[in-house]
């Protein structure tokens, strides 16, 4: 199925005009949505628990409230807290303060699609999901364009939910470069699959396996790091800019020939079957339930995974090599952290 890209000219209704907007959470996506909407002339307040995000929102000039207060004041409530805390946040502080005719939005369909959050039938439920991290959503807006976004409607109580979703996307700058309509099911399942099988899980496992093959064969860890990790950005940038075609036009004939000959030996039909199993666990809710249950138990699995990953040899080698490469950029964890 193909979908048609939409732009600012296709946003026919200024559905957010006269609406009080509450952005719940002021982390990676929250600060970007809030600041872009404010700069687009919208009436935005912040709802967040006390802490660094609360202080930062006030410092940035927003009227900042508790989540309960912000929900009571708002017509449109966008929940941009981390996925794992949204259910308890919604049930304790948002749901009791919703009114008929309100709209509730998300930037990812996780909690709605898997029914961890159930919104009353008299409230709209929409989505605006920019295809990029918050700092990029903000920076590109300030530069005069934006990041493409997906939009969706899960529940249309007022008949205006699609207009709200599209106008929100316009307000954050996404309609300048393109909007795609989707569903909560499609966005959630595709997003999780992309993260797990390719962009995060698949990629890091591939890099680590390549590093281990080289070092176990007696090659220097530092050289292995450059070959399987450091040069990854160069290749990904070419694919990002012009697809496989541009990448293959830009590399040597030797590298291109090796691409065709050896790629299928690594990513075999069995790997594809494994990917299908990953997708099945997403579709049937197994991954979602495992993730949420781990959070409710205090994150024992996630903590163990993080500790294991931090002790990988490739991480230790990379940390030392990057000290001599200031051109790779400052390692600023706070720039990407989601608080509260």
UniProtKB/Swiss-Prot annotation:
NADP(+) binds at residues 26-29, 49, 53, 83-86, 134. SUPFAM superfamilies: 6-phosphogluconate dehydrogenase C-terminal domain-like, NAD(P)-binding Rossmann-fold domains. It comes from the Bacteria. Binds 2 magnesium ions per subunit. It is an enzyme of class 1 (oxidoreductase). Keywords: Amino-acid biosynthesis, Branched-chain amino acid biosynthesis, Magnesium, Metal-binding, NADP, Oxidoreductase. Residues 3-182 form the KARI N-terminal Rossmann domain. Pfam families: KARI_C, KARI_N. Gene3D superfamilies: 6.10.240.10, NAD(P)-binding Rossmann-like Domain. One of its GO terms (molecular function) is magnesium ion binding. The active site is at 108. The keyword S-adenosyl-L-methionine does not apply. Pathway: Amino-acid biosynthesis; L-isoleucine biosynthesis; L-isoleucine from 2-oxobutanoate: step 2/4; Amino-acid biosynthesis; L-valine biosynthesis; L-valine from pyruvate: step 2/4. GO terms for cellular component: cytosol. InterPro entries: 6-PGluconate_DH-like_C_sf (IPR008927), KARI (IPR013023), KARI_C (IPR000506), KARI_N (IPR013116), KARI_prok (IPR014359), NAD(P)-bd_dom_sf (IPR036291). It catalyses: (2R)-2,3-dihydroxy-3-methylbutanoate + NADP(+) = (2S)-2-acetolactate + NADPH + H(+); (2R,3R)-2,3-dihydroxy-3-methylpentanoate + NADP(+) = (S)-2-ethyl-2-hydroxy-3-oxobutanoate + NADPH + H(+). Mg(2+) 2 binds at residues 191, 227, 231. Its cofactor is Mg(2+). GO terms for biological process: isoleucine biosynthetic process; L-valine biosynthetic process. Its EC number is 1.1.1.86. Residues 183-328 form the KARI C-terminal knotted domain. Substrate binds at residue 252. Mg(2+) 1 binds at residues 191, 195. Involved in the biosynthesis of branched-chain amino acids (BCAA). Catalyzes an alkyl-migration followed by a ketol-acid reduction of (S)-2-acetolactate (S2AL) to yield (R)-2,3-dihydroxy-isovalerate. In the isomerase reaction, S2AL is rearranged via a Mg-dependent methyl migration to produce 3-hydroxy-3-methyl-2-ketobutyrate (HMKB). In the reductase reaction, this 2-ketoacid undergoes a metal-dependent reduction by NADPH to yield (R)-2,3-dihydroxy-isovalerate. Belongs to the ketol-acid reductoisomerase family. This is Ketol-acid reductoisomerase (NADP(+)). It comes from Streptococcus pneumoniae (strain Hungary19A-6).
